[in-house]
C-alpha cells in the first residue's frame, strides 16, 4: 500500500498536527545547523497554501522524559520564525490548557509550535492516553519526521491511529528515494559504510550483500574487520565480541561476489584527542600504543577509483574521527569524490552530511537523507513504525 498523500486533501480551516524532526545541533543556545528545519519547509508551505492551521511537534535531544531547559525548542523556534512568512506562536507546554487554547485561536495559515514532546516520558512509551492528548489539538495528522520514523512513539505512531493520517512531502521523498536504492539501483552499486562500531552496522551490511557490487568500509569499525584477519591494529577501537561476525561478513561477501574493501593504510595517533602525534602507516599494520584515526591516502585513492565508476552510491558514516579536525581528511576526500561522480548518490548520517556541507557539495548529491538511524533501518529491510502507522485506518 502506498503512503496516503497530502496533496489532494482539503485542509482549509483544519487544525493539522505536523510531526517534524527539528532535532538540530545547538551550541551555547544557538542552532548550528538548520538543515533539518529547511527540509520540512516544502510541507509547511503546502499546508499554509491550503489554509491549514498548523500545530508543529518535534523532539530535541534526550531529556529523559523530564522538562529540561537545555533541550527546549525555544532557540529552534527563533530560527524557524525567520524561515516562514506566517505568524508563529510557541507553547511552553506540550499538552494541557496552553496548547489547547493557542491551537483553537490559530487562524488559517498560522503556526503553533509546541514544546519538546520528549519532556513527557509517555512520548517514548507510546502511552495511549498521551497520544489522545496530542490528538485533541488537531483534526488531521501529518508525519514529516522521517528521522524519527523508526521510533514507535506517541507523536510518531500512536497519534496516527487516532486522526486521518498523511505523509508529508519530505517523508514521501525519503521513502521513494530509499526504496529505489533497494529495488532497482543503477550498476555498479557502491555502498560506503563508516562509523565507529561494526555492531551498529551488521544488519545493514548483511542486507546489502545481495544488492551491492562494492562495499567500502571505513571509520573505527574497519579495525574490528582488520583484527579479524590478524592485521595488527595497535590500540585501535576493536569490538572483541564482534570479531567473529566481522570475519564471517568478509567470507559472506566473497561468496556473494561482493567486492568488500578495507583500508590498506591509515593515519594513526598516539592518543585519542586533538593533541595526538600523527603518522601514516600502510599494510604492515598499526604499532602498539598507536590507534587508527582515519583512512590513509592509498585507501582514499582505491575508494575514489571505485566511486568514479559507480552507477549508484549509498554513503553512511565517516571514514575517521570526524569530530577532530586532524582526522577529517579521509571523510572530506570521500565527500568530494562522491560529489564528482555521475552516479545517483544518497547520503545519510550526521557526520556524512556534515562532511558534504563542509565540502560545500550538497547541491551535487541526489538525495541527502534526514534520517541517520531511520535510513539505516530502512536499508536493513526493516519496517519503520512511523511509516507503517500511516498506512492504517484511523481507530473508530
From Swiss-Prot:
Belongs to the phosphoglycerate kinase family. GO terms for molecular function: ADP binding; ATP binding; phosphoglycerate kinase activity. Disulfide bonds: none annotated. It is found in: Cytoplasm. HAMAP family: Phosphoglyc_kinase. CDD domains: Phosphoglycerate_kinase. This is Phosphoglycerate kinase. InterPro entries: Phosphoglycerate_kinase, Phosphoglycerate_kinase_CS, Phosphoglycerate_kinase_N, Phosphoglycerate_kinase_sf. Substrate binds at residues 21-23, 36, 59-62, 118, 151. Its EC number is 2.7.2.3. It comes from the Bacteria. It is an enzyme of class 2 (transferase). Monomer. ATP binds at residues 201, 292, 323, 349-352.
Amino acid at each position: 500500500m502506498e503512503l496516503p498523500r497530502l496533496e489532494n486533501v482539503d485542509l482549509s480551516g483544519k487544525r493539522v498536527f505536523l510531526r517534524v524532526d527539528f532535532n538540530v545541533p545547538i551550541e551555547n543556545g544557538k542552532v548550528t545547523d538548520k538543515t533539518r528545519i529547511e527540509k520540512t519547509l516544502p510541507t509547511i508551505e503546502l499546508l499554509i497554501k491550503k489554509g491549514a492551521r498548523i500545530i508543529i511537534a518535534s523532539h530535541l535531544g534526550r531529556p529523559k522524559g523530564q522538562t529540561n531547559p537545555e533541550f527546549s525548542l525555544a532557540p529552534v523556534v527563533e530560527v524557524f520564525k525567520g524561515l516562514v512568512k506566517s505568524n508563529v506562536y510557541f507553547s511552553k507546554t506540550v499538552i494541557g490548557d496552553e496548547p489547547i487554547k493557542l491551537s483553537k485561536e490559530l487562524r488559517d495559515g498560522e503556526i503553533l509550535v509546541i514544546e519538546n514532546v520528549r519532556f513527557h516520558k509517555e512520548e517514548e512509551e507510546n502511552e495511549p492516553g498521551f497520544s489522545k492528548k496530542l490528538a485533541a489539538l488537531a483534526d488531521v495528522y501529518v508525519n514529516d519526521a522521517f528521522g524519527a520514523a523508526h521510533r514507535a512513539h506517541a507523536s510518531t505512531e500512536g497519534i496516527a491511529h487516532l486522526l486521518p493520517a498523511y505523509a508529508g512531502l519530505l517523508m514521501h521523498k525519503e521513502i521513494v528515494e530509499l526504496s529505489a536504492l533497494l529495488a532497482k539501483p543503477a550498476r555498479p552499486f557502491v555502498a560506503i559504510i563508516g562509523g565507529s562500531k561494526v555492531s551498529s552496522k551488521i544488519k545493514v551490511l548483511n542486507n546489502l550483500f545481495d544488492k551491492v557490487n562494492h562495499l567500502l568500509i571505513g571509520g573505527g569499525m574497519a579495525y574490528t574487520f582488520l583484527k579479524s584477519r590478524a592485521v595488527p591494529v595497535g590500540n585501535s577501537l576493536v569490538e572483541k565480541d564482534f570479531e567473529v561476525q566481522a570475519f564471517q561478513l568478509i567470507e559472506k561477501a566473497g561468496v556473494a561476489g561482493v567486492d568488500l574493501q578495507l583500508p590498506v593504510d591509515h593515519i594513526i595517533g598516539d592518543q585519542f584527542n586533538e593533541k595526538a602525534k600523527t603518522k601514516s602507516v600502510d599494510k604492515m599494520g598499526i604499532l602498539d600504543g598507536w590507534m587508527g584515526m582515519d583512512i590513509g591516502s592509498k585507501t582514499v585513492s582505491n575508494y575514489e577509483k571505485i566511486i568514479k565508476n559507480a552507477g549508484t552510491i549509498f554513503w553512511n558514516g565517516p571514514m575517521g574521527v570526524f569530530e577532530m579536525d586532524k582526522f577529517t581528511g579521509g571523510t572530506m576526500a570521500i565527500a568530494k569524490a562522491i560529489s564528482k561522480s555521475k552516479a545517483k548518490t544518497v547520503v545519510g548520517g550526521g557526520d556524512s552530511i556534515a562532511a558534504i556541507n563542509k565540502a560545500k557539495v550538497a547541491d551535487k548529491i541526489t538525495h541527502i537523507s534526514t534520517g541517520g538511524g531511520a535510513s539505516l533501518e530502512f536499508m536493513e529491510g526493516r519496517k519503520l513504525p512511523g511509516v507503517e502507522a500511516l498506512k492504517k485506518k484511523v481507530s473508530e
